[in-house]
From Swiss-Prot:
It comes from Shewanella halifaxensis (strain HAW-EB4). Residues 9-68 form the Sm domain. GO terms for cellular component: cytosol. Belongs to the Hfq family. One of its GO terms (biological process) is regulation of translation, ncRNA-mediated. One of its GO terms (molecular function) is RNA binding. InterPro entries: Hfq (IPR005001), LSM_dom_sf (IPR010920), Sm (IPR047575). This is RNA-binding protein Hfq. Keywords: RNA-binding, Stress response.
């Protein structure tokens, strides 16, 4: 598993597993809505009234419509690493 994928895969898998409705914003501003049906290294299969294959390089943001649990040890470690890298020590 690539270093940059250690948070992405558990996040998408939890969305898929819990059937969480999502809004996916593309880099060109288009908003897509549906449920993550499947995904791989390059694409997300988004299901609504039809299934759409969305290339990850075209995605800006994935917004879940409700809270959900990403229960994965790797995801927790990846987030902790991200927080450590971006902590400037200024707790205002």
């Amino acid at each position: 598993m690539a270093k940059g994928q250690s948070l992405q895969d558990p996040f998408l898998n939890a969305l898929r597993r819990e059937r969480v409705p999502v809004s996916i914003y593309l880099v060109n501003g288009i908003k897509l809505q549906g449920q993550v049906e499947s995904f791989d290294q390059f694409v997300i299969l988004l299901k609504n009234t039809v299934s759409q294959m969305v290339y990850k390089h075209a995605i800006s943001t994935v917004v879940p419509s409700r809270p959900f649990n990403v229960s994965n040890h790797q995801a927790t470690n990846a987030q902790a690493g991200f927080n450590a890298q971006h902590d400037d020590g200024d707790d205002k």
